């Protein structure tokens, strides 16, 4: 058996990264693609490896010969690489393909070590490795039947999103018998080039053979890691996928989202309602996708109107943000004097302030719990102008009930302290909507109070980036509206607010379902040895590790062995040295049980 690697392409989409080298000379985590591939091939009993070079071919040949002198490597040059595609590169190897069975690979692949053995050990004579379609995949797709026959090759121009559930992506790894190449593939390859030219793809020939039903090529599905690197984003994703466990965890944590790029990842780090929006609302959003994509959104005036309708408060009291983060930044920059903060907290607020302007309260217990009376007692003799309260708190889940909140906000009003209440998680609390301060009479009676709410978290739409701040302080609201851009909300977010009223009952039911699941999950977690669960009124649990395992080591085990991402809190401000805390989101029953089982296996 021989291997053929196609490595003539220019890799234009990679820009500066391929300015003076071909794609397979790119490094992923310090290892060149071609080095990784040749190392993997060296473990297989191959008579020779044929590499088709083209763009910057001399550099590639010199590098390979200096590093892999123990391999029998044959180079084939494609001198017209700049005006041909891989169909011509493969055609240049036709005589070799007649002589031996071939393992055919593209050079821009990064593959798990197990993948090539899948092709070598497949029971069928001719195989194409395929993977179930995911959104990152581009290029040739196939459809297969129940017996793994490839019934069609689908080129990019024939791709139909409505057929995505049936698609598999070709991994661009094939094992082809020499008789198949000699009697079927190469004659069609020659005819195809003569009729359609050299700037095509070799998969098109397989498609033609399949359509006339003379092919004997089977699909072998894989679920191991692999990636095809065509642009700089692909390069970054590949670096994350194939990083060491430690580096992979760090890269995922520093991405701050975008985890759809990593199929199968269970995200217990970010905090989103698992039960809303439901299918009917999503279908309405989909049905209006094209006009929302093509039309400009409204300005701040209309969006304030929609947000007021959304929460049942007056338009003039509301400013809408591109996520609560935009409003947090604007508000923190607006406030004068010192700010009271309860630690540990959601650090987006204090990170927007000078440390010297912060007056910090640290609850003196392992649950980080506190009451309204605790806050009034601590801050009553402190020289603060504003007090921040996240209720329920993040990350502790501590909750001050509504009656006590009223005492606290009135105390703040009487002592000339502006109280900033972030109630992004209040809908998850027992009592739900009855605990909100987003009420006209309260805002008017307590005009210095500011209420912040992230729509992303409670309502399960973080991709829309929506948040609101409400206050009856008309001068503050006017300054904040002036500070944010007129078109700070996109059309999809605006339309979501526009139609939400039709789905309010669904949202209420979703919150009820969530509270039931929180109770179930809490009961499960309490069964895990070495894990102390802090009571929570939010959509997450803060947990202390009471055994020998550190939070970092647990996070590492979960991402490595279970593809589960959690929040390691040990580096957050406000946690005592030596204590090990994690925060885990509460998802649906299936996902929560998967995490519970992982905990049981690791922490036993």
Give names to the regions the model predicted:
Residues 112-196:
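Conserved core of the sugar-phosphate nucleotidyltransferase
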Residues 277, 403, 560-561, 566, ...:
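PLP-dependent enzyme catalytic core of the Aspartate aminotransferase-like
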Residues 515, 528-562:
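Conserved PLP-binding catalytic core of the aspartate aminotransferase-like
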Residues 168-170, 278, 299, 448-527, ...:
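PLP-dependent aminotransferase class I/II
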Residues 237-295, 382-383:
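N-terminal "arm"/small-domain region of PLP-dependent enzymes with the aminotransferase-like
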Residues 118-122, 369-383, 395-458:
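Active-site pre-lysine segment of PLP-dependent enzymes
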């Amino acid at each position: 058996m021989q291997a053929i690697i196609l490595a003539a392409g220019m890799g234009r989409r990679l820009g500066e990264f391929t300015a003076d080298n071909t794609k397979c000379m790119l490094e992923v985590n310090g290892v060149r693609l071609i080095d990784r591939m040749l190392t993997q091939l060296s473990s297989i009993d191959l008579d020779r490896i044929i590499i088709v070079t083209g763009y910057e071919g001399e550099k590639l040949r010199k590098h390979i010969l200096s590093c892999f002198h123990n391999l029998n490597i044959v180079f084939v040059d494609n001198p017209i690489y700049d005006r041909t595609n891989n169909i011509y590169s493969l055609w240049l190897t036709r005589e070799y393909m007649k002589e031996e069975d071939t393992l055919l690979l593209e050079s821009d692949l990064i593959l798990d070590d197990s993948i090539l053995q899948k092709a070598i050990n497949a029971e069928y004579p001719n195989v194409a490795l395929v993977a179930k379609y995911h959104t990152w995949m581009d290029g040739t797709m196939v459809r297969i039947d129940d017996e793994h026959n490839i019934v069609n090759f689908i080129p990019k121009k024939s791709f139909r999103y409505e057929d995505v559930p049936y698609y598999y992506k070709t991994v661009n790894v094939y094992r082809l018998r020499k008789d198949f190449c000699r009697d079927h593939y190469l004659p069609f390859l020659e005819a195809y080039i003569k009729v359609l030219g050299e700037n095509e793809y070799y998969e098109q020939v397989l498609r033609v053979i399949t359509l006339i039903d003379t092919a004997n090529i089977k699909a072998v599905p894989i679920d191991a890691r692999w990636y095809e690197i065509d642009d700089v984003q692909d390069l970054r994703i590949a670096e994350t996928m194939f990083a060491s466990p430690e580096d992979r965890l760090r890269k995922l944590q520093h991405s701050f989202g975008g985890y759809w790029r990593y199929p199968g990842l269970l995200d217990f780090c970010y905090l989103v309602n698992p039960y809303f929006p439901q299918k009917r609302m999503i279908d309405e959003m989909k049905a209006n996708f094209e006009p929302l994509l093509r039309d400009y959104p409204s300005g701040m005036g209309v969006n304030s109107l929609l947000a007021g309708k959304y929460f049942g408060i007056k338009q003039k009291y509301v400013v809408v943000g591109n996520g609560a983060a935009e409003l947090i930044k604007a508000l923190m920059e607006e406030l004068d004097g010192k700010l009271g903060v309860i630690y540990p907290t959601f650090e987006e607020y204090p990170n927007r302030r000078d440390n010297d302007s912060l007056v910090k309260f640290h609850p003196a217990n392992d649950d980080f719990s506190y009451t309204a009376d605790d806050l009034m007692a601590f801050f009553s003799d402190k020289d603060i102008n504003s007090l921040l309260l996240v209720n329920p708190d993040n990350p502790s889940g501590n909750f001050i009930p509504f009656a006590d909140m009223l005492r606290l906000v009135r105390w703040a009003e009487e002592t000339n302290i502006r109280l900033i209440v972030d109630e992004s998680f209040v809908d998850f609390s027992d009592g739900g909507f009855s605990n909100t301060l987003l009420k006209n009479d309260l805002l008017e009676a307590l005009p210095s109070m500011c209420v912040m709410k992230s729509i992303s978290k409670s309502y399960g739409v973080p991709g829309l980036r929506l948040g609101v701040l409400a206050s009856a302080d008309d001068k503050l609201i006017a300054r904040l509206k002036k500070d944010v851009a007129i078109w700070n909300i996109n059309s999809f977010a605006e339309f979501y607010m526009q139609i939400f009223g039709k789905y309010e009952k669904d949202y209420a039911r979703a919150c009820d379902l969530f509270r039931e699941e929180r109770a179930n999950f809490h009961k499960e977690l309490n069964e895990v040895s070495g894990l102390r669960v802090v009571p929570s009124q939010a959509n997450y649990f803060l947990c202390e590790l009471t055994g020998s395992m550190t939070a970092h080591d647990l996070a590492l085990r979960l991402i490595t062995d279970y593809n589960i991402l959690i929040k390691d809190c040990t580096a957050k401000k406000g946690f005592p040295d030596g204590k090990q805390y994690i925060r885990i989101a509460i998802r649906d029953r299936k996902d929560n049980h998967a995490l519970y089982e992982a905990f049981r296996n690791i922490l036993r």
